[in-house]
Amino acid sequence: MPTRPARSGLHSLAQLLRSDVVGGFLLIGGALTALIWANSPFGHVYEALRSFSFGPEALHLHLTVEAWVADGLLAIFFFVVGNELKQEFVHGELRNPRRAMLPIVAAVCGMAVPALIYAAFNAGDPARLPGWGIPMATDIAFAVAILAVVGRHLPSPLRTFLLTLAIVDDLGAIIVIAVFYTASLSFLPLIGAGMLLAVFGYLQRGRGVAARLNSAALPNWVVYLPLAGVIWALVHASGVHATIAGVAMGLLMRTVPLAGEKESPSHRLAHLLGPWSSGLVLPVFAVMSAGVVFAGGLGAVLDDTAALGIIAGLVVGKTVGIAGGSWVTTKLTAAELSPALRWIDITGMALLAGIGFTVSLLITDLSFPDYPEALVHAKAGVLLASLLATVLGAVVLAVRNAHYRKLRQAVSPQ
């Protein structure tokens, strides 16, 4: 048993890791470590680690370390995000359908405009045109981390807007992968996953059989952990990106405590998994995903229309699609922007949405299997666009953060 000082130390560490700012710095540190390592003389060690495979072959889970992190470990982060969104839909900003509609429409516009921009750059090149899906995706982990680091005083609805937008964006990108970039989709595992998700949702209700289960001597994790593992494995086997399993289970969590409960399962798991998500999952993910090698120099990258289309799509297309699409939507429909936000806030957030790593790099691999030069340049383009979007978004949001800090100090000078 841990001693009292040890327990106190672990509690303090957990509290520290629950901070989005601390998690953001850890993730950025992981990304910088990966970039330096991959482009150093020891880059072959980094690549060997990422490509090392393990897992049961019979279950089609003999995966590389990189895949285990991107598909498996990151599902924990997506569960935490889905769970947080569920709380917002039930108790928070997204209870208002007119406000919930706006980030959803923004996500759709933020996928369409970058794809069109990329297609315009590469319309005359059949070898590079298949990469139109690359600039569609927002890397939610990096975007939320940067927002946390630069925007401690920004209104909370901005983070909710970004979370909702990024989840819809990821879902859209995964549908694009399934329809346009996947040779075959296995529907039987997908149906099985859907049925088990229904069981998961039923158990969350805490009535009937679920109530008897909750009152049994067995701890809940004995049931939920294997169930979650099987759901994840089935989604993975279907060909759909397995992190969707995490989002789905997070959205099914019960956010209202039953009679006799001190807190709901949603709040309990948010408290438990938050430190693991920010302190372990995101930094490890950054180390495994951000190691892009700059081969051939920057000039060769910027001479390639695939890289230029990606950079323009992620930096310009995302901003125009999200901010412009949101503004037009508020003028033409009943959708409305939160009173706590201004359009410059949405513009800064839209710039951050131009950060593309995981899904963008995945689509890059699927787009150019027979064109290694385009593949290398496109990956470098994703990285350059993400760095540019980070800097521009951080500058805009840092200015807005200072503005909101002054407003709060004026209201409560102490």
Swiss-Prot record:
Subcellular location: Cell membrane
Membrane disposition: Multi-pass membrane protein
Any one GO biological process: regulation of pH
InterPro entries xref list: Na/H_antiporter_dom_sf (IPR023171), NhaA (IPR004670)
Gene3D superfamilies: Na+/H+ antiporter like domain
GO function term, MF aspect, one: sodium:proton antiporter activity
Purpose: Na(+)/H(+) antiporter that extrudes sodium in exchange for external protons.
PANTHER family recorded: NA(+)_H(+) ANTIPORTER NHAA, SODIUM ION/PROTON ANTIPORTER NHAA-RELATED
Name of the protein: Na(+)/H(+) antiporter NhaA
Species this protein is from: Thermobifida fusca (strain YX)
Classification of source organism: Bacteria, Bacillati, Actinomycetota, Actinomycetes, Streptosporangiales
